[in-house]
């Protein structure tokens, strides 16, 4: 649809992964600043909006931007799951809970490409953005009802300069690796 070269297409996945790294760094600050429930719900709401934007995008730039926003928010959501496991489960059940969570983390990337291929064959690549929405909405309802809302009295300062420099460094490194010997 967009008539892209291979060195452009990789930014759809690479942008997500690089942004996910940045999101993981933002998570601790967001939880301390807004509370665990609000930080999770905010990240999930933004992820849903980014999924909708990605699914209806009419340009490659907007598609990559949607994936980057998805990556930042997914990076905030993933460690939040581990925090929640430690908050909710008693010590003697944490190993089992982390094992179940870990299975999802491992199986997701193993199953997603095949499922994505089926969705693309049956409908369109846009369906890959919409298929996650019911689970995200369900997660928001459950989190809104049951997620503990721990919040620190004194939220740490976010090192914006460090975060921006890390982000730029990641993009520069990935750009160099993607460009190769061209």
Predicted features and spans:
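Hydrophobic transmembrane-helix bundles of small-molecule transporters
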Residues: 121-182
